């Protein structure tokens, strides 16, 4: 799988911004991606060393439009820990 297909987008929230102090970065990833694939993709795209990958499956939320009910899509979240001294500049200033 192409690294750019595995990593969909960075997740920039207040909670994730606080994790950056501990060298942890959050991404939305492909639902079928494994931890080794996510690690390789991050290392290739951002030229950093990854020490740990934690993943979680996020369930879609119930949404309403008038009388109709539906769910947003389920997705997968990855929290990546980088080696000491490595940074991802994409997140700086967020």
Curated annotation (Swiss-Prot):
<comment type="similarity">
    <text>Belongs to the universal ribosomal protein uL23 family.</text>
</comment>
<dbReference type="GO" id="GO:1990904">
    <property type="term" value="C:ribonucleoprotein complex"/>
</dbReference>
<comment type="function">
    <text>One of the early assembly proteins it binds 23S rRNA. One of the proteins that surrounds the polypeptide exit tunnel on the outside of the ribosome. Forms the main docking site for trigger factor binding to the ribosome.</text>
</comment>
<dbReference type="GO" id="GO:0005840">
    <property type="term" value="C:ribosome"/>
</dbReference>
<dbReference type="InterPro" id="IPR001014">
    <property type="entry name" value="Ribosomal_uL23_CS"/>
</dbReference>
<dbReference type="Pfam" id="PF00276">
    <property type="entry name" value="Ribosomal_L23"/>
</dbReference>
<keyword id="KW-0689">Ribosomal protein</keyword>
<dbReference type="InterPro" id="IPR013025">
    <property type="entry name" value="Ribosomal_uL23-like"/>
</dbReference>
<dbReference type="InterPro" id="IPR012678">
    <property type="entry name" value="Ribosomal_uL23/eL15/eS24_sf"/>
</dbReference>
<dbReference type="GO" id="GO:0003735">
    <property type="term" value="F:structural constituent of ribosome"/>
</dbReference>
<keyword id="KW-0687">Ribonucleoprotein</keyword>
<comment type="subunit">
    <text>Part of the 50S ribosomal subunit. Contacts protein L29, and trigger factor when it is bound to the ribosome.</text>
</comment>
<dbReference type="GO" id="GO:0006412">
    <property type="term" value="P:translation"/>
</dbReference>
<dbReference type="InterPro" id="IPR012677">
    <property type="entry name" value="Nucleotide-bd_a/b_plait_sf"/>
</dbReference>
<keyword id="KW-0694">RNA-binding</keyword>
<keyword id="KW-0699">rRNA-binding</keyword>
<dbReference type="GO" id="GO:0019843">
    <property type="term" value="F:rRNA binding"/>
</dbReference>
<protein>
    <recommendedName>
        <fullName>Large ribosomal subunit protein uL23</fullName>
    </recommendedName>
</protein>
